[in-house]
Amino acid sequence: MNKTAIALLALLASSVSLAATPWQKITQPVPGSAQSIGSFSNGCIVGADTLPIQSEHYQVMRTDQRRYFGHPDLVMFIQRLSSQVSNLGMGTVLIGDMGMPAGGRFNGGHASHQTGLDVDIFLQLPKTRRTSAQLLRPQALDLVSRDGKHVVSTLWKPEIFSLIKLAAQDKDVTRIFVNPAIKQQLCLDAGTDRDWLRKVRPWFQHRAHMHVRLRCPADSLECEDQPLPPPGDGCGAELQSWFEPPKPGTTKPEKKTPPPLPPSCQALLDEHVI
């Protein structure tokens, strides 16, 4: 499948009706031991943790959206990464969307983030704390040139390279999605230490943030992991294919109906949503 077709599918997956989904009616985590259920784009979570809003190492954006819930492993990853960044004097980590209290489908903006194992992290590390008003209406910093072929040199900082590398080297991280131009710059800057680049995957948009995904926890028996990324650093022909012009004659795919929920997620909805 060519890149244009994939882009259209991704857009359709994330641009669903803005009407509230049943999952948004669940306002608190479902009690129980933490269990991520299903796949990243069709699942839910029992026993989600709430990311503490107050931290000296990170700040949470758009708290009015209440998307700061996730598996305990995700909360610990955010705390671990932000502590590393702070100890290195790099700045404050800005946390975007995680998931809803019970996971599940959003009414727009995300196709994944459903099992409590995904988090968006802005690719900027401010030295001064954001105000409450700034956190509610954050300003994204677009690091990619208008033609999409490279990063903006005046905006690309060594600290951003280090932030992505630190996240990729974490034991629980399985994938990090960034814009192809950002992946290309990481490949140029990486030097001889390149093993971590395998986890960094090029994807549409993601010009101002990275989307970090954790592996399924060992005790979440109903969680469906993705296959591992292909071997290698991903800096060769695969990456360059993202910069090729779309093939002529690409047609817009039909909008697909969401697949049935995993039985455990459907049972959760039946029990907790009237």
From Swiss-Prot:
This is Penicillin-insensitive murein endopeptidase. The lineage of its organism: Bacteria, Pseudomonadati, Pseudomonadota, Gammaproteobacteria, Enterobacterales. It is an enzyme of class 3 (hydrolase). One of its GO terms (cellular component) is outer membrane-bounded periplasmic space. GO terms for biological process: peptidoglycan metabolic process; proteolysis. SUPFAM superfamilies: Hedgehog/DD-peptidase (SSF55166). It comes from the Bacteria. Its main location: periplasm. Murein endopeptidase that cleaves the D-alanyl-meso-2,6-diamino-pimelyl amide bond that connects peptidoglycan strands. Likely plays a role in the removal of murein from the sacculus. Its cofactor is Zn(2+). The keyword Ribosomal protein does not apply. It comes from Escherichia coli O157:H7. InterPro entries: Hedgehog_sig/DD-Pept_Zn-bd_sf, Peptidase_M74. Dimer. The keyword Transport does not apply. Residues 227-274 are annotated as: Disordered. Zn(2+) 1 binds at residues 110, 113, 120, 211. Coiled coil: none annotated. It is found in: Periplasm. Belongs to the peptidase M74 family. Binds 2 Zn(2+) ions per subunit. Zn(2+) ion 1 is bound in the active site. Zn(2+) ion 2 is bound at the dimer interface by residues from both subunits. Its EC number is 3.4.24.-. Disulfide bonds join 44-265, 187-235, 216-223. GO terms for molecular function: metal ion binding; metalloendopeptidase activity; serine-type endopeptidase activity.
